[in-house]
Amino acid sequence: VNEIRDAILADHLSDIGGLAVPDSYRGVLVRRDEQDVFEGLPTKEKDPRRSLHVEEVATPELGPGEAVVAVMASSVNYNTVWTSIFEPVSTFGFLARYGKLSELTKKHDLPYHVVGSDLAGVVLRVGPGVNKWKPGDEVVAHCLSVELEDPAGHDDTMMDPQQRIWGFETNFGGLAELALVKSNQLMPKPGHLTWEEAAAPGLVNSTAYRQLVSHNGANMKQGDTVLIWGASGGLGSYATQMALNGGAIPVCVVSSPEKAEIVRRMGAELVIDRSAEGYRFWKDEHEQDPKEWQRLGKKIRELTGGDDPDIVFEHPGRETFGASVYVAKKGGTIVTCASTSGYMHSYDNRYLWMNLKRIVGSHFANYKEAWEANRLIDKGLIHPTLSKVYPMEEVGQAALDVHRNAHQGKVGVLTLAPEEGLGVRDTAKREQHLEAINRFRGV
C-alpha cells in the first residue's frame, strides 16, 4: 500500500498498473459479533467510537465489471453513522442477502463490514469487461451499486430490484486504503480540488441533484421558490447551491445564527433561523400544532413577498413533515429523501389532496444524475462543503460529530493521503474558486 501511495504522491500515475495489488489493506469496519453492543441504549447515547474499528482486512478478489481503487480520501455520511450504531437495522443482513445473489457477490458476506460511500482516489486495477477506465485514472465514485440484469433498471437504474448503496448495503466501502466498486460507479475527479475536497460531495451532491433538479425528483425550474430544511448541512448545502445556480429562490431553514451566516455566504438571501423563531411543530409526542405550521407559512410569505414554496426539500422527516405538507404551494411538491428525526410521518391530508400537492420519494441518484452532479462540481458551479477533516484513525470521532450534528456541511477522512491539500491538478481554476471552496472550512 505504501508503494502505491508513494507513486500517487510522486505523480507516477502511469506506473500504477505495474504495481502489485496488496493482499491486505486497512479499512474502517464494524464487526458482526458486536451488533448488540448498544442494546438498550437510546439512539443519542450510541457512540460510533465504540463500534468503528480501523483494521487490516484481506483484499477482495476483483471480478468482471469491477475496479479496485486506491483511496486517498473519503467522508462520513449518515449511513456510516447508521451502520456504526446498528440502526435502524444491522447492515449484516444486507451483506448476507447480497452474498446469496451469485458466486461473484458471495465475497461481500463477511463477519466484518468495511464502510463508507464516498471516495476520491486512483484506479489500481480493473476487471474483465471494463474499457472506460484504466489504472492511473484519478476518480471519484458515486454510491449506486446495481446489477442491471432486470429490465426495470434500464429506464432508471434506481428502479433496479438489485440496486444497493455501496459501502452501506455492500462491503468494501470507501473509508479504507483500497475500495472495490463497480466500474459504472466511477467518475472523473475534478482537477481543481484536493483529494479530501473531491471525496466530500459524492453521495449528498448526487442525492440533492436527483431530489431537486432531475425530472425524477422535483424538476426544479427558474423562479421556483424552494424551502430547504437544514440548508447549511451536508445535503441542504448542495440543494441551496443548486437552487441559486438554477435560477430558483431558496428559502433556507437553519437552526442557529452561525448557520444562517453560512447560507448567506453561499448567496442565499431568504433565511429562517428556527432557534430565533422558536417553532414547536409538536405539542407532545403524539399531537402536532397546526398553528405553528401557519406561523411558518406566514414567515415564508413575508420573506418571499407572498409566495408559498413550489418545492419543499424534505429530509428531517417526522419533526417537520406535517409543516412541509402544509406550507407547500397549491399544486406544489414535497420531495423527501430521508427521515433523520423519525420515519413515521404524520400530516393533515386535507392540505395535500384538496390543494393538489404531491409527495415524491427520492433516493440517491442514477449514474446519469450522479455524473451531471459531478460535472457541476468540475465546472465550478457547485462547490464542496467540507468543514473538517480527520485522519482515518479518528473516524469514530468524525462519525460522532455527524451523529450528534456537531458539524457543518461534510466531514472528511484522509485514508492514503498523508495530509490535506494534495491532489490538485488545475491550479488556475482552483484560484478562481478558492473562496467558495473554503467557505465551510473551520465553521
Q: Which residues are covered by each model-predicted region?
A:
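Rossmann-fold NAD(P)-binding glycine/threonine-rich loop
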Residues: 339-355
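Adenosine-nucleotide cofactor-binding segment
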Residues: 228, 244-319
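NAD(P)H dinucleotide-binding glycine-rich loop of Rossmann-like/cofactor-binding domains
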Residues: 102-111, 117, 144-230
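C-terminal hydrophobic helical "lid"/dimerization subdomain
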Residues: 2-23, 322-326, 367-443
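Hydrophobic/small residue at the entry helix of a nucleotide-binding pocket
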Residues: 207, 234-235, 319-320
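Glycine-rich beta-strand-centered segment in the early N-terminal region that forms part
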Residues: 58-75, 88-152
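Helix-to-beta-strand junctions that scaffold the AdoMet/dcAdoMet cofactor pocket
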Residues: 221, 328-329
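A short N-terminal beta-strand-loop micro-motif at the entrance of redox/enzyme domains
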Residues: 4-20, 35-73, 112-114, 129-130
